[in-house]
Design a protein with these regions (language model features):
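Active-site phosphate-binding/coordination module
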Residues: 16-117
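Conserved residues at the C-terminal ends of beta-strands
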Residues: 7, 64, 146
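Conserved acidic, metal-coordinating active-site core of Asp-based
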Residues: 93, 97-99, 104-177
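Extreme N-terminal starter segment of soluble prokaryotic enzymes
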Residues: 1-5
């Protein structure tokens, strides 16, 4: 069985979430040669649906930085979650540092009710849930924190790694996220 796995942002996608015609033709050639194609991304399954329409295929999906894996038929064959107790502790630490979070479980997008979500339009396929307190959030697939100051995020990542690295994968994917 042959597989080609590709990252999404910055690899398959150009700016503005557009897939080039060249990329579409290349993937189509692979599929016609019976090569299994997979997309690996930090996005959730709902966050890649528009891109799949551009490609015109239903590939394997490795989503949420590996927390979820879906078959071409859409069946979830891996669903790794951060347990609720750990989620609560991590979110409290984030809030203690005066930062906001975006948290994801399947099609649900959680955020603090105190947070103004100006960019929710970029997540139209997710069900938005504004939570009163961190204890109200269930097990999660992924938590995102972003800030314009990379130093703030590096400090937070170090704090979270010291407290939770044995319980959850903690990483800085970009200077501001």
């Amino acid at each position: 069985m042959k597989f080609v796995v590709s990252d999404l942002d910055g690899t398959l996608l150009h700016s503005h979430n557009i897939v080039s015609e060249y990329t579409i033709r290349t993937i189509d050639k692979l599929v016609k040669k019976n090569v299994n194609f997979a997309i690996a991304t930090g996005r959730g399954q709902q966050g890649v649906q528009g891109i799949l329409k551009q490609l015109g295929i239903n590939p394997y999906l490795i989503c949420n930085n590996g927390a979820n894996i879906y078959t071409p038929e859409g069946e979830c064959i891996l669903d790794k979650r951060i347990p609720k107790k750990i989620v609560t502790e991590i979110l409290k630490e984030i809030r203690k540092n005066n930062l906001f979070y975006s948290a994801f479980l399947n099609e649900f997008y959680f955020h603090s009710k105190d947070e103004t979500v100006e960019d929710f339009t970029s997540r139209p396929l997710f069900t938005e849930v504004a939570v009163e307190k961190e204890e109200d959030i269930p097990d999660l697939n992924k938590i995102i924190v972003s800030d314009d100051n990379p130093k703030v995020l590096i400090e937070l990542v170090n704090i979270l790694k010291n407290k939770f690295s044995h319980l959850a994968e903690i990483m800085l994917s970009q200077p501001t996220c």
